[in-house]
């Protein structure tokens, strides 16, 4: 598998379609820096599947597209193609039979890449699979870029292992292992889902089994809870009695102490008022004195500041006067010096003017002499140079014509040989084209494509339908589980409510049950079960009816009256007759019957009972009632003519009507949920059956589609290869015909050029001999004129220097005179200004003396007055401090009394509140005892003295939690249990199948691991041996080796040890850049020696090497080229010498790279002719 050519278009700087042929095993790429040589390496890496823009020296994948230049627009897409010669059949699998393999990658501005294999669109994975085990890849050891040769040897042990694995061909095994692990992961996920389903199913089965046992505990726990609650009430009542006695004694003591503290507080307030009045008077007197003190202080401060400021100003004026007098004396001295200096400068300037005029006349004469000599020299030089130029031109023309004749002779020989080769190729291609049948391949591809498209369409339709069925199944299961959970919860609630309601309706009374059983009325409805009460009036109805809620509903009372008279009295037995006629309307306002709906004759029980919204309205309406009538409120308060009844329903019937309404609602909800579950179960079952059918058909269709895809890929590859060969051969025939015609024209043109060159050579040789004699004569004349011109130029230069010196001196004198005059004028002005300033200073000193004495006298008087006032203020402050101390002491005593009163008042309030709270709680407990029909004293008498409420409370809570933990009871669990058990058996079969599949996959993993271990060990040992042999060869000595970081061959990293001759370094990182590069080269060549990749790309690997190492490196590359094809980029001439074929990358147009190729062997052969 050999790389034939590289085609680039629009990739980075290669904007034009460019082909780089690779005819030999040593191809060098040369060119200046920045011309695009490394873009060739990037192109190869990119087309082989590189997906990281960073490894291509870019930020995004679109950066590889030519981005435009000063003269070019940006390209719309980039394309790179590699063409391989696979005549050796090294490409594995289905590609082994192709003589030529072409892979191409192109990318547009949107960053999406497309891959093509022999002209057929494919995936990136297909490209990487093609190179698995060959040593090639986007980041393989066969591509070594700038700077990476050293990083290769410094790679981490894990990264170095990947290189050894690629050399061992393990990558394809690892890919298979990865795919097997994915299948194992999917299998484990399915097992986990099955385990979750089985676990959930197991929980449901256990739940159904447990529900039957829960009902047995309910009654026993309820009775025990009632007993403990009654005893707990007794404990609380006894504790409240003791608390009330204690609070009453504490409250009496606190009230006595409160009266005593109130008297103390009043005495403190009276004393505090007298002290505050005295403190106010003292404070006012001190404020007046302090105000006067501040006024005196301010005036004294002002006078003191004024005196200091005046004294400072006078001192500054004296200093200023002395400084001005000194300045005036200096100005007068400087003025006299400048007058003398100005007279001397003017005299010297007049003398220089005479000398300068004489020298300027001499300079004019010297310039004339020099110009005449220069003109003669120029004329002579131009004549001699013209003759010399003509002679050299004629000699160059003669040499050019000789070279041209030699090239024309060689070119003629080449054209003759080329004609013979082209005629032979033309004959061979015509025969091959006649034998190639492309149409048969096209018909085969069309047939497979049509069948595959039909199969793919069927697969997609089946997949869509299967997904729809999965959604349907998932949706049904998602709805079924909550529905089942809701059904179980409601069924449990129904069972609990039925148990409670059975007790409330008296169905568990044994004596009455025997009578009803004898009368065949055990299953008859009870009054509380047949009536419906308007919301809010349940308490009122329960209060009025009481035990009559347990009445048995019968069609007629007549058959049972005689039996009742003869029967033994039961604990309670009531009968109620169904309504036989219409209900009479009431006349005294809303009746309780108006809030009840029932098919029963309730007029006898509820006649004359009216309704009111609250007790006040009931009392108002009771005034107009008849003796047998009464009014009841929603809360159960009942009032009649001359009587009032305030009671709650008895504990057995409390909430029975609301519970009955809730029970009817729950039964209706159970029916709805059961219907919903049946519908959802049917939908889920239908979806599962349909999904299994669709998945089976989909697998068969996908299998057929895969087979057709493989066949289509093979057929397309064969068609593409045939079409490519046909197109290539036809194109080559056209090229050959065109080249033969061009050869005939070139041979005619070559003969004409040869005759022209011979004639031009003879003419140039004759003219050159004639001009040689004339040029010698002109040379002597030119030398004599040069000497005369040099003498005139030196004389002129000397005079010019003297004139410049005199002019410079004159200019300097004029400048000095002007400066001195200006300075003298400034000194005169400064003298007058300084004298005026001195007079003003003397006058100001005289004027400031008198005010200073007056202010000093006034300052002494004010200071004495402030001292007297300060002593008086100190006495007043001491008096005020004594009064404030007394105020603070009395205020502290009052505050202490207030705090004690506040705390005591709050304590008394809390004790009263606690007493009231305890009293209310005791009354509440006594009411609860009354409702339960027990006396507190009797219950407490049966309790031990050390009984603690917390223990009884914990027992009640424990029993409540046990009852709560029982949850609802499900009476329909058997059928569901059988259904779920059958489903569990099906899931267990699925689990066994998946477990067996997982075991098979694990065996496959073990087999792959064994193969990988064996291959890795063998490859590591061979590469290590080759590395140990290559290293001394490159370094001229030393030693190197590869070492494993651990014993596990599946995970062990690989480290590199290298010691050049004479060194004992402990780490590879201590080597120089050149030594690292040579060590990495030795390792790469050892890998290539074991498993040579089809080609190797080296990008300036020799850059860090010196000349001796470059020589050894080049010789080793040349030896390795017998097995491996090398494409190297270099700037080193020694490396270029080993190349069989040179490709030069140029950038004549800014930003655009082009390739110029040279066959070195052909060039050497041509040069030797």
From Swiss-Prot:
GO terms for molecular function: ATP binding; ATP hydrolysis activity; DNA binding. The gene is smc. HAMAP family: Smc_prok. It comes from the Bacteria. Its main location: cytoplasm. Residues 170-265, 307-481, 656-914, 985-1014 form a coiled coil. ATP binds at residues 32-39. Belongs to the SMC family. Contains large globular domains required for ATP hydrolysis at each terminus and a third globular domain forming a flexible SMC hinge near the middle of the molecule. These domains are separated by coiled-coil structures. InterPro entries: P-loop_NTPase, RecF/RecN/SMC_N, SMC, SMC_hinge, SMC_hinge_sf, SMC_prok. Keywords: ATP-binding, Coiled coil, Cytoplasm, DNA-binding, Nucleotide-binding. One of its GO terms (biological process) is DNA replication. It comes from Methylococcus capsulatus (strain ATCC 33009 / NCIMB 11132 / Bath). Residues 525-620 form the SMC hinge domain. It is found in: Cytoplasm. One of its GO terms (cellular component) is chromosome. Required for chromosome condensation and partitioning. It holds the Pfam family SMC_hinge. This is Chromosome partition protein Smc. Homodimer.
């Amino acid at each position: 598998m050999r790389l034939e050519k590289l085609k680039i278009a629009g990739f980075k700087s290669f904007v034009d379609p460019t082909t780089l042929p690779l005819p030999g095993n040593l191809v060098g790429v040369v060119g200046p820096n920045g011309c695009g040589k490394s873009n060739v390496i990037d192109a190869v890496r990119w087309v082989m599947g590189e997906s990281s823009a960073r490894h291509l020296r870019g930020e995004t994948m679109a950066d590889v597209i030519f981005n435009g230049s000063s003269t070019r627009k940006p390209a719309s897409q980039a394309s790179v193609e590699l063409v391989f010669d696979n005549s050796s059949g090294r490409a594995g699998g289905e590609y082994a039979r192709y003589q030529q393999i072409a892979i191409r990658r192109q990318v547009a501005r949107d960053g999406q890449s497309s891959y093509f294999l022999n002209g057929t669109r494919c995936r990136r994975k297909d490209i990487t699979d093609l190179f698995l085990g060959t040593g090639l890849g986007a980041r393989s050891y066969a591509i070594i870029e700038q700077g990476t040769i050293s990083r290769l040897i410094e790679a981490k042990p894990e990264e170095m292992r990947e290189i050894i694995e690629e050399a061992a061909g393990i990558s394809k095994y690892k890919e298979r292992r990865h795919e097997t692990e994915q299948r194992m992961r999917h299998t484990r996920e399915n097992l986990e889902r099955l385990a979750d389903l089985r676990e959930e199913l197991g929980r449901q089965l256990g739940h159904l089994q447990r529900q039957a046992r829960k009902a047995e505990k309910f009654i026993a726990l309820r009775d025990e809870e009632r007993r403990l609650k009654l005893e707990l009430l007794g404990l609380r009542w006894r504790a409240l009695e003791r608390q009330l006695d204690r609070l009453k004694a504490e409250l009496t003591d606190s009230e006595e102490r409160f009266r005593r503290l109130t008297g103390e507080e009043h005495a403190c307030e009276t004393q505090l008022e007298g002290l505050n009045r005295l403190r106010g008077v003292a404070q006012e007197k001190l404020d007046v004195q302090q105000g006067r003190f501040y006024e005196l202080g301010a005036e004294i401060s002002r006078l003191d500041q004024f005196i200091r400021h005046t004294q400072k100003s006078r001192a500054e004026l004296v200093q200023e006067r002395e400084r001005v007098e000194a300045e005036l004396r200096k100005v007068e001295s400087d003025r006299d010096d400048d007058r003398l200096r100005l007279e001397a400068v003017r005299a010297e300037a007049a003398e220089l003017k005479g000398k300068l005029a004489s020298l300027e006349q001499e300079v004019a004469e010297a310039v004339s002499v020099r110009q005449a000599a220069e003109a003669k020299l120029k004329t002579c030089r131009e004549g001699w140079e013209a003759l010399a130029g003509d002679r050299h031109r004629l000699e160059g023309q003669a040499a050019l014509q000789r070279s041209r004749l030699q090239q024309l002779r060689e070119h003629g020989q080449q054209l003759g040989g080329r004609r013979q080769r082209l005629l032979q190729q033309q004959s061979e291609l015509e025969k091959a084209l006649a034998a190639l049948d492309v149409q048969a391949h096209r018909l085969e591809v069309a047939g497979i494509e049509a069948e595959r498209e039909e199969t793919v369409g069927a697969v997609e339709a089946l997949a869509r339908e299967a997904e729809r069925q999965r959604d349907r199944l998932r949706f049904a299961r998602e709805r079924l589980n909550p529905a089942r959970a809701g059904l179980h919860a409601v069924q449990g609630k129904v069972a609990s409510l039925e148990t409670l309601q059975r007790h409330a309706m008296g169905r568990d009374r044994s004596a009455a049950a025997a009578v009803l059983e004898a009368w065949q009325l055990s299953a008859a409805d009870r009054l509380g079960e047949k009536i419906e009460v308007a919301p809010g009036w349940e308490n009122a109805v329960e209060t009025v009816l009481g035990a009559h809620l347990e009445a048995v509903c019968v069609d007629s009372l007549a058959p049972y009256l005689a039996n009742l008279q003869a029967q033994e009295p039961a604990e309670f037995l009531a009968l109620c007759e169904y309504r036989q006629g219409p209900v009479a309307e009431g006349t005294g306002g809303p009746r309780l019957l108006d809030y009840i709906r029932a098919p029963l004759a309730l007029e006898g029980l509820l006649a004359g009972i009216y309704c009111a919204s609250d007790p006040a309205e009931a009392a108002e309406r009771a005034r107009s009632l008849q003796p047998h009538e009464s009014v009841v409120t929603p809360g159960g308060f009942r009032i009649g003519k001359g009587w009032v009844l305030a009671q709650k329903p008895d504990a057995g019937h409390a909430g029975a009507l609301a519970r009955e309404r809730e029970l009817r609602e729950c039964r209706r909800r159970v029916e709805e949920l059961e219907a919903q579950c049946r519908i959802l179960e049917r939908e889920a079952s239908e979806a599962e059956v349909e999904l299994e059918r669709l998945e089976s058909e989909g697998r068969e269709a996908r299998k057929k589609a895969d087979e057709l895809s493989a066949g289509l890929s093979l057929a397309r590859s064969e068609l593409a290869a045939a079409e490519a060969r046909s197109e290539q051969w036809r194109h080559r025939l056209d090229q050959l015909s065109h080249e033969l015609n061009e050869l005939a024209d070139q041979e005619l043109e070559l003969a004409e050029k040869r005759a022209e060159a011979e004639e031009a050579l003879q003419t140039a040789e004759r003219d050159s001999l004639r001009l040689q004699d004339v040029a010698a004569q002109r040379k002597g004349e030119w030398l004599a004129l040069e000497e005369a011109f040099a003498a005139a130029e030196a004389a002129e230069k000397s005079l010019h220097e003297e004139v410049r010196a005199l002019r410079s001196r004159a200019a300097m004198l004029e400048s000095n005179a002007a400066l001195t005059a200006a300075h003298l004028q400034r000194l005169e002005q400064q003298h007058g200004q300084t004298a005026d300033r001195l007079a003003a200073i003397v006058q100001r000193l005289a004027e400031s003396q008198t005010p200073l004495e007056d202010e000093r006298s006034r300052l002494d008087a004010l200071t004495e007055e402030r001292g007297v006032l300060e002593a008086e203020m100190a006495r007043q402050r001491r008096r005020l401090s004594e009064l404030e101390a007394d105020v603070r002491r009395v205020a502290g005593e009052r505050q202490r009394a207030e705090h004690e009163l506040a705390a005591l008042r709050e304590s008394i309030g809390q004790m009263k509140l606690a007493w009231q709270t305890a009293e209310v709680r005791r009354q509440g407990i006594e009411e609860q005892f009354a409702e339960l029909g027990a006396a507190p004293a009797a219950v407490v008498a049966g309790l031990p003295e050390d009984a603690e409420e917390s223990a009884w409370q914990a027992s009640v809570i424990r029993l409540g939690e046990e009852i709560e933990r029982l949850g609802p009871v499900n009476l329909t669990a058997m059928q569901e249990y059988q259904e779920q058990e059958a489903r569990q058996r099906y899931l267990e079969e699925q689990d066994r199948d998946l477990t067996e599949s997982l075991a098979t996959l694990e065996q496959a993993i073990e087999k792959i691991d064994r193969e990988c271990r064996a291959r890795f060990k063998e490859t590591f040992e061979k590469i290590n041996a080759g590395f140990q042999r290559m290293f001394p060869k490159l370094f001229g000595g030393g030693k190197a080796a590869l070492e494993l970081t651990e014993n596990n061959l599946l995970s062990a990293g690989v480290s590199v040890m290298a010691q050049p001759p004479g060194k004992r370094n402990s780490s590879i990182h201590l080597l120089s850049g050149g030594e690292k590069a040579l060590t990495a080269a030795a390792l790469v060549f050892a890998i290539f020696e074991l498993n040579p990749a089809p080609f190797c790309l080296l990008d300036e690997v020799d850059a860090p090497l010196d000349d001796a190492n470059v020589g050894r490196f080049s010789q080793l590359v040349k030896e390795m080229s017998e097995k491996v094809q090398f494409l190297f980029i270099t700037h080193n001439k020694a490396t270029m010498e080993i190349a069989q074929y040179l490709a030069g990358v140029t950038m004549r147009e800014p930003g655009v790279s082009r390739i110029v190729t040279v066959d070195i062997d052909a060039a050497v052969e041509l040069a030797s002719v």
